[in-house]
Swiss-Prot record:
The chain crosses the membrane at residues 18-38, 66-86, 103-123, 148-168, 186-206, 237-257, 269-289, 312-332, 340-360, 379-399, 414-434, 447-467. The gene is COX1. O2 binds at Y247. It is a multi-pass membrane protein. Cu cation binds at H243, H292, H293. Binds 2 heme A groups non-covalently per subunit. Binds a copper B center. It is found in: Mitochondrion inner membrane. Its cofactor is heme; Cu cation. This is Cytochrome c oxidase subunit 1. It comes from Triticum aestivum.
Amino acid sequence: MTNMVRWLFSTNHKDIGTLYFIFGAIAGVMGTCFSVLIRMELARPGDQILGGNHQLYNVLITAHAFLMIFFMVMPAMIGGFGNWFVPILIGAPDMAFPRLNNISFWLLPPSLLLLLSSALVEVGSGTGWTVYPPLSGITSHSGGAVDLAIFSLHLSGISSILGSINFITTIFNMRGPGMTMHRLPLFVWSVLVTAFLLLLSLPVLAGAITMLLTDRNFNTTFFDPAGGGDPILYQHLFWFFGHPEVYILILPGFGIISHIVSTFSRKPVFGYLGMVYAMISIGVLGFLVWAHHMFTVGLDVDTRAYFTAATMIIAVPTGIKIFSWIATMWGGSIQYKTPMLFAVGFIFLFTIGGLTGIVLANSGLDIALHDTYYVVAHFHYVLSMGAVFALFAGFYYWVGKIFGRTYPETLGQIHFWITFFGVNLTFFPMHFLGLSGMPRRIPDYPDAYAGWNALSSFGSYISVVGIRRFFVVVAITSSSGKNQKCAESPWAVEQNPTTLEWLVQSPPAFHTFGELPAVKETKS
């Protein structure tokens, strides 16, 4: 009973962070299964495993996106690493609102349940993650499936809003003595910026999907031209949330990568203030570029010119971050342990994804590339190899602190190389498919596209083998087997620890600090 009470009613940031990790892992496995089903269907031309059920294909696409974004990356990055390490890094005893933290987590399992049940109602929700009307309207999806998906998004959104309020309050009000804003570790800064993005963008999504809900069930016509509405309004509202959302997914990853690159290069981060202002700039600019997802809907030419220019400007702070990471490594005494491998992989692959993003920012080019596999390749390079690589990097970096045991280094490196090879083989050929005009969200294709699709599907099978390696590592590390106890500071940063998590025991005590740590100075 006491164990159940500990986990159900927990107000401890580390316990809640662990729950987020477990939840993210479960959702991630499900999302990966869906992606493999998608790649099996696309492995060769003609109807394959889905037997011609094209609605089911779109349900898989939709569920894959929702699972990976709202139930894997966000819970693991912000809920998992954020909850676990933000209080420790700022020298706080816990989060500002511990019980709010608990409900933030426990809103997610019901939300996941609603999403999964939507697949079992009538023909499921085959709208794509954007849920565009009129396809998501009552005439095209007549059952309750889309309504269930909308409620799922509502719950997940409330969870994220409450969590972000908690993080903002914690970071502003609960820093330890001497921990000024300009001494905050970069991961804490990244979570702070992310929390503001969530707080400002999610209410807009909530408004859009609530309007869609009333369109479907109460005969309003917000998005129905027959009653004076406009489906393009939905797209504006959705993408005003949707674009900040992609930065929400990647910003905490930026913070994690900064810590890792600094630790394994044995140097402080190059240009700390520049890194902070770059993240803030990315956050602000992220709200000013949403219509680059809509270049093909008939926007005015000067509107498209503005959104093209604004989108390209985001590349500037992003470039500052990438060059600062490279400058941190420059002249450093680099150790290629597993976290550093994932961090270097992140920098390389995220840069490729960023370059294809610059290509897509051109409204003229995007007319040709919109809704082709070029776009799929672009955002999977920044998510599947950006956000997910950052998650893996953070896991290997902090797993000793979380479990109190060291991970098997060789298995970790094997995991990296299999995954690196697999994801590249999956997504690089998609650039060629997109340039040849293969459209997204379509389960069949002409024979001309067969070669690259077969290669892509093969790559996804390799990625699954890599993920299986990862769970082997988790199992070995979490069990009290041969692997030895983890030191307070496994990466030997005792000489000059720059962050507080390496000064507490591994794993940290239930109440991390006996007395609040005072930060005297930061050595440069």
